[in-house]
């Protein structure tokens, strides 16, 4: 249909105008009036699913990362305990605890307080570890305190148990060092030969001969397993039992001593 002069003017000023609904050329392009829900989902559902998928993936990756870090720290902690115990292990001692058992012992002692502080006092993991270590060593942690009765009760029990456990551990270490020193001294004494001066020092009855008892007593003195005072007390007890002064203890002497 040809345009009028006014339509041509409006076309030049405002651009193309939408065709009227009466134009028959529009009928072939008109879509049927069908609800859009029959063919596609609403647009906001796609956006919501798109937004939730990355969040779920992020949370899963973070949880997996935390689990891996916790497992790695546990392995490192136990490995360090086993390594330290293994380096200080004395091969001469026949009665030794398995290194893994010792590492687990120290792990349980420190980790129990670590969990109590974290879940009861509600502080961070690193602060919980420092707090538990300071509680065990009775140093204290002035910046934090237990505000609930449950936390105070658990802290009281944990302080008592952990302090005794650490004291027992230090006692074990001191005994181990003393035993190691004694074994080294005994090994050195037994590896030495006796000199002339030592011969006269070991000859208790001064008869110019060393009996097995005299030699054993002298070696025990050198190993510091028996002192001169201990030897004197043993001799006094022997003299009390040897009533006949024969240098030997008989059954008659024992019977007389028992009846008295």
From Swiss-Prot:
Which SUPFAM superfamilies does the entry link to? EF-hand (SSF47473), Voltage-gated potassium channels (SSF81324)
Task: Give the Cytoplasmic membrane side ranges.
Answer: 1-68, 174-260
Any matching Pfam family = Ion_trans_2
Membrane-crossing residue ranges in chain numbering: 69-89, 153-173
- Tell me which InterPro entries the record gives: 2pore_dom_K_chnl, EF-hand-dom_pair, EF_Hand_1_Ca_BS, K_chnl_dom
Q: Which residues bind Ca(2+) 1?
A: 203, 205, 207, 209, 214
Expressing tissues: Expressed in hydathodes and the vascular tissues of roots, stems, leaves and flowers.
What keyword terms does UniProt attach to this protein? Calcium, Ion channel, Ion transport, Membrane, Metal-binding, Potassium, Potassium channel, Potassium transport, Repeat, Transmembrane, Transmembrane helix, Transport, Vacuole
Q: Which sites bind Ca(2+) 2? A: 242, 246, 248, 253
CC annotations in GO: plant-type vacuole membrane
Q: Where is this region: Disordered?
A: 1-34
Q: Which residues are intramembrane? A: 127-146
Write the signal peptide boundaries.
none
The UniProt similarity line reads: Belongs to the two pore domain potassium channel (TC 1.A.1.7) family.
**Known function:** Probable calcium-activated potassium channel.
Protein name per Swiss-Prot or TrEMBL: Potassium inward rectifier (Kir)-like channel 3
What organism does the record attribute this protein to? Answer: Arabidopsis thaliana (Mouse-ear cress)
Q: Which gene encodes it?
A: KCO3
